[in-house]
Amino acid sequence: MNDTTSKECPSGPSAWSIASQWVDPGAQSAPWWKLIGSQLCLLAQEARYPIEKQFEILLFLYAKVLPRVGPLNKGEKFNSPSRYTSLLTDDGTPFEYSWKWNNSTSSPDIRYCIEAIGSHTGSSTDPYNYLETEKLLTQDLASCVPGLDLTWFHHFVKAFGIDQRQMASNNPDAPKANMFVAFEHVQKGVVVKAYFLPAAEAGSGGPPTFETFASATRGVLNNTAALDASLDFVKNNEMGIDLVPDMLAVDCVDPNKSRLKLYVSTTATSFASIVSVMTLGGKITDVDRGIKELEVLLSFALGKETPISRDDELNVQSVFDKGLAHDFDLYGRMTYYFDIAPSSKLPDVKLYIPVIRFGRSDEAVASGLGQYLRLRQRDQFHDGFMRALGSIGAGHPEGSGHRLQTYLAVAFQRDGSLAITSYINPGVYHDDLKG
């Protein structure tokens, strides 16, 4: 057999190495493939995804996603006019990974979120970064992703005015709209999620309000009970009134099966404030065990040597680096989302703890989480997670200041356990990244 056409496999996860033999090294997306492709494949490999699923993730990424994130402009300054700065991460990287932890009988789920970036993104032609996202969903994915339904996507694009070509405010400092898209590779296929960050209120130039989101949401809900309960909490509860709305997300599936997720944030970080929001001021009941589990998890993940105080605010362990892509801190507030299902009377609530601020280090957060998982017989994949984290972080020299783990997300489960997800920023645009 003539082997003169064979290629040497690049080093990396096996599925990625094999696929890389046939990737055009001169393609615009090749640098993204080298970084993001290898890291996503490693996460899937360590989560013990079947090899065929790993190839599916890689093919989907290469064929559908990478062409919509623009070139990797490594080496340019953050404010370079040729480089759009994504709001997804603190260094402007338009990718974020997540690892949803297993329970005692399941395996982890790997997801990732992107901000689509085109040649006109951020310009007067596309001030709200709509065009590339719209192309990705309607041109690239609508015809090939089974079960994809863009009904709610189109509704909220129009409701928030994201498809407009004219700024809602003449104030250059007014909030700009942004859109993110996330992909969850489930056992059969992929679930697509869309995220909406509305622009400034028309006329006022101020940030969007709860009414901004409520007005848009009522247009698709026949049953507004869960939405109304959420709005009542933020208007009338002592802890709720400090919450501000940030973002809305939807699953791009049949609206009868979809969910609305309203993201909110607050400067309050005490355990009492967390419990208040997670229970909607006591309206969500039968979560006493979950609250105790959350207290234990926080003690481990945040490196507390004494029990968590109910009333004291959490101590900031890592301060905001003003030298990165944004002049404001993406991780300076405790974040939650209200999961509003069309058939529910109350929302489910998920907490996002910015461990990048309140955890001592990546090593400390991951090790503390591992201690908790071992106590609950859920640590079967922790060693793999640590290997993946070490590999992703290998490009950042020790002392670089880049923190991989951004959030630890937690939700109460019906059996009293916790649903836990770790979020990871690969830090592609961090100044110290090698390669």
From Swiss-Prot:
E.C. code: 2.5.1.-
Top EC category: transferase
GO biological process: alkaloid metabolic process
Superkingdom to which the source organism belongs: Eukaryota
Pathway noted in the entry: Secondary metabolite biosynthesis
GO molecular function: prenyltransferase activity
Keyword tags: Prenyltransferase, Transferase
UniProt keyword annotation of tRNA processing present: no
Chain positions recorded as dimethylallyl diphosphate binding sites: 111, 193, 195, 259, 261, 263, 352, 423
Function: DMATS-type prenyltransferase; part of the fragmented gene cluster that mediates the biosynthesis of fusarochromene, a tryptophan-derived metabolite closely related to a group of mycotoxins including fusarochromanone. Within the pathway, fscG catalyzes the prenylation of the primary alcohol produced by fscA which is necessary for the formation of the chromene ring by the oxidoreductase fscI. The first step of the pathway is the epimerization of L-tryptophan to D-tryptophan in the presence of the NRPS-like tryptophan epimerase fscC.
Listed PANTHER family: INDOLE PRENYLTRANSFERASE TDIB-RELATED (PTHR40627), PRENYLTRANSFERASE ASQH1-RELATED (PTHR40627:SF4)
Family classification: Belongs to the tryptophan dimethylallyltransferase family.
Protein name, entry field: DMATS-type prenyltransferase fscG
Species of origin: Fusarium equiseti (Fusarium scirpi)
Lineage of the organism: Eukaryota, Fungi, Dikarya, Ascomycota, Pezizomycotina
